[in-house]
Each structure stands twice: as C-alpha cells, then as structure tokens.
C-alpha cells in the first residue's frame, strides 16, 4: 500500500498488509455445489481428466452396479463417495483411473413394479418394453443424485446390463461356461419364493425371526422283529410305539420319505405310557420332560445298528394315501443339540435330506413333491390338497394328533429364511433347474470351480483383511449355483432343449452365438420373438425353447466380461484393480463375479476387494422407518452441503459401521469450517503474490518457512501412503490436525506478524508467501479427493488459469536441505513453545498480562533445547509471540522453566509489540522502530521467523 493511500484514510495511517480473497468464509455449500456440478458437466471436466491421464499406468475401480429402482439412499452415498475418493486419489497419484458407473437393470423388482402398474396379464413383449422404460427413468433419477454428491465419472456413457451389447455378451459368457463343462440341469432343492414364483440366489435370502409350530411325532414300528434284534432283544416287550422325530416344519410331514440317524449316536428304547419310543439316549431325560411322560430305558444301540429299519408314516391311519414306510438312513449331520436325535427326511424340501436320499439310491422320479410354485399343495394330496402350506400347518398338527402320532406341539420362534424383496418366508423346494457345479471337473480336466475360486480368494488383497476368511468360508461351503430363474425380464438361457429327454441341442454353442448376434441388434426381445425354425429348422419338432432366464447375479457377476472386456473395453481392462462394495457383497457381487471369472478365466476378476460397513444412527442402531432414524443424503446435501456428507464418510472408519446423526453432522461441519478458514487465510495472504515475480529461492527462505515446507512434505508422504491403502479416516484426521494445530495453531500464527507488518515486497514477507504458495498447492491436492467442491472452489481462486484441480497430480514440493534435522529441531521448539503458551495463559488468568505480546519471557533451557532456542536469535520472540524473549542455560531438564513478566514498555499502534523504541521517531510517537523501518526505510532483517 502506498503512503498516499494511508494519508487519504486516517484510520489506515500506518497500514498493514491485510489482504482479502474472493474465497468466502462461509461455504454456502447447498447453493454453490449445484453450480459446480453444472460447470463440471458443461466444461467436460471428466473428459479433461481422461485426456490429462493418457499414457499413464491404468488403475481400474470397477463399479458394482446399483439396482435401477428407487431413490438413492445413504448407503448409496457412502458407496459412491468412497469410490469417488479412490478414483480421484489414484488419478492424482499419477494413474489413469477412469470411472464408468453402471446399473443392474433386469430382475424381479422391476418386473414387480410393472405388474403393480399394469397388471400381471401383459404380453411378454410389452413387459420388456415397459421394464426398459422404467429402468431408464430410474437410472436418470439416480444419476442426478450421484452427480449432486460430487462424484465424477463417465455419466454420459455408463454401462447398463440391459444394453443390447451387454445382454448379448452375457449370453456369450453363458456359452463359455457351458463349453467348459460347468453347467448341468438337475432336480434339486433350491431357495424358492412363492411370491416371486422363482428360485432365489443365496444373496437374495435374508433371515428374520418367525414363529412356527414345533412338533414331536412318532413313526410307528413297521418291522418290530428287526427292531428288537437291533437292540439285542429277542422281541419287543410291547407292540405299540415307534421312533420319534422333532421338526419345525409340519408342512413337510406329508412328503416324508425317510428318517435320518447318526451312525455313532447311541439310541435308547424307552418304555413309556405312549408305548416304546426310540430317542437318542442323551435326549431321553429332556424329551420325557417335554412329552410329560415317565420312561424307563430298556435297551440301547448305536445308530448304525438301526440302518434300513422301516417305520410307518405317522398319517398312515388317517388316510390310505399315507400307507407307506420310511427307511432309516445314516447321516453325519444329525445332532443331539435339540430334538430327539432323529431327523425326518422330506428330500424335496431339504438339501441334506435330498443328498442323503440320493446317496441311498432314490431317483428324481421317486421324490414326493406336492408343493406347487405358489405355495399350495397339489389338489390330489390326501387331507390337505389345495391348501397353502402355512395354512396347512395347524391342520397337519390336528391330523397327527387324531392319528395318535403327536407327542408334543408348541409354538417356536426361530430365525427363518425370507425373500429379501417380499419379506415373506421361503422354502427349499426341489425343482428342475440349471446349475453351475461347484465340484464338477471341467472338460479340460482342470481344477473344480470351488478349487479355482478358493485360489482366487487367496490371490486377492482384502481391505480390511478379515474379508478374506469370510469369502473363503462362503466359497468353501456353498452349494452349486442355481443359474436359472422362472421370470420374463431377464437375459434368457437361450437353449433349445429336447422335448422328451431334456438334453441340450448338439449345436448349442453355435446356436447361442447366433442368438447373441440377434440380441446385440434387438435386445433380449429377439429371443422372445424368435421362431425356433429360423435357427434349427425341422429340429423344432424335437426341441423347444428354454423359457428360463439367468439369475440377475449372473448379469452383474459377468460385468468383468461384458463391461471390462466388452462395452467399455476402450476405457477399462481386466482384471480390475479394485471392487468396492458393502460387506453384504461377499455373498453377492464379489461372490458371483469370482465364480464366473473362475469358470471363464481360471482367476479372480479383481486384484483387490474393499468392503465398507453399513450406516447406523448415533446409538449404533440400523436405520429404519419404524425407528424414524433414517437420514436422507439429498436432504443433508440441500441443508448442509454434499461436502459435509463427503467429509463425514472420509473421516469415518468405513471398515465397521458408519454412525451418523445430527450431532455427528454438527461436529463434521465444525471440522469443515476449520479447514475452510485455513484455506481462506492461505488464499488471502497470497492474493498479492505472483510466483514468477515474487518467489524467493529455497536457500534464501527464513528457517521456519523451510521447516513448514519440509514438515508438509513429510506429512504428504504419510497421507499418500494412507491413500494408497484406502485408509481415508487417518488422512482426514491428520489434515484436520495439520490445519488446526500445525498451521493455524503454530506456523500461520507465527507468520501473521511477518505477513502483516513486514514491508510488502520484503524478502521476509515474500519468503513466507513462497512457503504458503507451496503449502497451498500441496494442501488443495490432498484435500481434493474428498473435499472436491471446496478444493475446486479454492483452486479456481488460487490458479484461475487452470481448468480444474482434478487434472493435477500430487504436488512435488521443493527439496529442503537437511529437512529431517530441521523437522526434529522445530519439534523441540514447538514443545518449548507449548510450555511458554501454558505459562502465558497462567499469567493472563492471574491478570498479570493481557495479550501474549504484553509479555516478556525468560526460558530456562538445557541441552538441545537451549541450542535450538538460541539459534533463533532475536527472532525467538516472534515464534513465542511475545514482545521479548531471553534464553538462560541450565544444567538439566529438571531445572527448565519459563518466567513471564509484563513489559514495562509502550505498545506499538501498528504491530502491537511492546518495545523500548516506541516513539523513537518524534513525528510517529505511537510507532515502534521496526514498524518505522518497515514502512519508511529498508525494513527489518529477519532470518529465522
């Protein structure tokens, strides 16, 4: 500022260098953020990032597709923002890290929406047309929400599993796994939802408590002589009685075909008021109590001795249709934790039952399977035909009681399988489905799918590490994958199946490719409208079109094929570096992707898996409508700003649950303000600084400036290490400490005197500004991945000629000679300064001084502290923010102390220091000597601070 300007304004008689900046103190985020979203889109910022990244090594985060249905929720926000932080941080680390968002478009939820709106009788072609339109509308709605959160990506060209090219490539992927020999058709119990009318994937099953009748039922002796022999008796002492089972599914009793015992468990023959009962010996006492009977054990035998004995069906006396016997099979899965140690077996409705009966020679045609796809019994089932299985439960209990077979019935609350969409109970139901075999040896004679997938888990990096064992266990123990679904809105399993034998057409692989070509042009509708004669000619008399669709988990699970190497192969590559989803995806997308890639490529489709937890409220409770504790990200963005959501996510350890509440958001907002205020200070004090014109060479900087840059460079190295390991909450914690303590509480605090009172163009001030320039470059770039709106806003003030901060890479700080020693030295000085600050505060509390500048301090120091303090010379007072500072040497640390005295001198009107030379120039009676020099002469000389 010129003197003339000072004279024209009496209040600025002795001006200081107080500068302003267009970067406002108030973020006004809800208003400004949408403007940035619009600007980023209009100016093609994502494309500019891609152009700037050309030729760098690729880093591929592959987007797990959200379902194209409904508004985005807080879980979506967590997921998309974490991905955005990863992608931006990898771009800034010098990678070419594209982000192609995607959507999962087929499947039941959309089909249900179409049924709700238009009824269930629409022709298939119309269902598909309306489903496509609905999914497109939902995608556009969600896309707006994701962009509002500051997520940058190829929003103009996302992948959609319903795009024709993706549908076609999915059919080709199906061809690949058939060619390799993993796919077979079979009758097997699968998760079945009556409301869906379809099989469900494991990932579509959730568990909720349900209350059902639990019953203990007696199967009467059919072979009393053999039974007596098994127990080492010449004959049974009485004819009445039988073997007792316990079940929580009375509806399966009409389909009973066997009984299972453990070969090594000891079973007792117990004489009771209800006849002779066979029960596991260690369960006798509990069962007698439950049945309200008294009993005497008359013989025991291991389960193996009872193998192949037969017992009458418990409803045999109620209806001739049940006059059959059940054989005893042995199974290691039988336990004595609850029940009787005897398991009743309905092979059509239980996996272990099914496997046991198969192992004992039953064929598919032997299985009794009276439950239809809608949950009702077939009309011909004796006593219960036409009833829903749930309505039949009490009637079956009554019938068992009337037949004299019921020993106990009571209500039982247990965790039970439910459909994740309908929230209704589901069952295991034997149906003819297409499966991918986990333990099938492929045609090339190589490893099984299970073996290959487990090797893939071992070869994958997990963040956090506990995810490895979780996924490993799931793969190790899972059943074969049910690939087929009985729906319309899905990618077809485009097979031609022999009408009598059920065998695939011998030209299946060739035919799948022909279908894929048509789907590529016209979508899956091409299969629906296809006349078989077009492809198989007269074979159409022998073969029919398979009507099943693929599990939607196959849609998303093959995106490594139809997206990474298909629709978006120009941008992406296989394998991906990272898949990032919620912890539920160990049984979902992570899982299905691993299986399909293991079948197609013999390896995992990803190098790393990152898992985040779910959102909970401040008390750790899940978000739910009933609790009224849900938080809408759209509402928070419009009230506080998306930046606050981004900062909350980045500052939370996502490996566990992410707690959020109004109180937590308030704390996050306060943290944001501290960072923003730091940026405002930096930008304001650089507003008259032109690097090309004013920069001071590193070796001419004041010592504290060299320290600040060396310290910031060291911090950046730590932060980049955290970014590389996807550890974002330490990044935020360290940056908040850096802004509030290292900068605001120390360096910038010390700097204010030099910035404000030194001559505007002095070396001392320009040295400080040069350091601030480097600090601002570094700070904005490490903030940008998570505080994207704020970093961009500050960047446009700092570097107005630049398009965007997101084309930058992490800052290369200038090298500071002896930086490690410098950092160590200033750590000592800051420690002493902390002691001085404490002493000053005590003096202020005792009313001995006002501000710290009214104080003169004497520091008694020893050893390295003494050396560090004295090395600063007269500049020590600036570091301590006092008007004078003296150092006295003492022998050891025990003698170290700080003395504070009030200055006896006058206060300078301009710099507020209390100095002996205030008024030394008569024409400026309120000005100190150094301010006079800084204003009217060559300015003071400063070397350290």
Swiss-Prot record:
Upper lineage: Bacteria, Pseudomonadati, Pseudomonadota, Betaproteobacteria, Burkholderiales
Recorded GO CC terms: cytosol
Record family assignment: Belongs to the class-I aminoacyl-tRNA synthetase family. IleS type 1 subfamily.
GO molecular function: aminoacyl-tRNA deacylase activity; ATP binding; isoleucine-tRNA ligase activity; tRNA binding; zinc ion binding
Catalysed reactions listed for this entry: tRNA(Ile) + L-isoleucine + ATP = L-isoleucyl-tRNA(Ile) + AMP + diphosphate
Region forming the signal peptide: none
Binding positions (L-isoleucyl-5'-AMP): 581
Record-given protein name: Isoleucine--tRNA ligase
GO-annotated biological processes: isoleucyl-tRNA aminoacylation
Top-level enzyme category: ligase
Transmembrane stretches, start-end: none
Organism: Burkholderia cenocepacia (strain ATCC BAA-245 / DSM 16553 / LMG 16656 / NCTC 13227 / J2315 / CF5610)
